[in-house]
Structure formats: structure tokens, C-alpha cells
Amino acid sequence: MAHKKAGGSSRNGRDSESKRLGVKRYGGQFVLAGNIIVRQRGTEYHPGENVGIGKDHTLFALKDGTVKFLVKGAAKRRTVVIEAAQEAAAA
């Protein structure tokens, strides 16, 4: 008779690829329209002025400008806004 039971293969050794979530452009940084500001699961950050939201809750710039992170409202929601870049006056 066998002294030990046959060794099975390990059931570990698997992991999913990281999704690279998080803030991609920080407060004070200049962004172009279409730039991704935050990749997230759910609305950890909410879109504010000049910021759009994708179907996967990604926040992106709708206009060129500077990123600003705010805490707004009674619910103290973390909100991202873009302060639009001032267009140079035509001479």
C-alpha cells in the first residue's frame, strides 16, 4: 500500500491582471479635451463642470483647461471640474 496519498497539483497560482485604475491627471495639471482624468469602479469621484463620464464611470475632460478636485454639497461628494483655459483675444 502507498505510504502517502498521491500529491495533487496546487490549486493556487492564478491572479487577474491589474486594471490600472486611479487618478490619471492631478489637480493643477493642464488637460486637453478628451484626456482621461480618473479611471474608477463606481462614482468615487463625480463629474463637475466641463467633465464627462463614460459608461465605465471614467471621468474625462470636455474642454481644454486645468483640473481641480473639490468637495461639494451636503453629501461631501468628491467632484472633478475643469477650469476652462482662457482663449487669447484675437488682435
Curated annotation (Swiss-Prot):
Superkingdom classification of source: Bacteria
Gene3D superfamilies, sorted: 2.40.50.100
Annotated Pfam families: Ribosomal_L27 (PF01016)
Signal peptide: none
SUPFAM superfamilies documented for this protein: Ribosomal L27 protein-like (SSF110324)
Presence of the UniProt keyword Secreted in the record: no
One example GO MF annotation: structural constituent of ribosome
Keywords (A to Z) from UniProt: Ribonucleoprotein, Ribosomal protein
Coiled-coil blocks: none
A GO cellular-component term linked to this record: cytosolic large ribosomal subunit
Record HAMAP family: Ribosomal_bL27 (MF_00539)
Annotated PANTHER family: LARGE RIBOSOMAL SUBUNIT PROTEIN BL27M (PTHR15893:SF0), RIBOSOMAL PROTEIN L27 (PTHR15893)
UniProt-recorded name of the protein: Large ribosomal subunit protein bL27
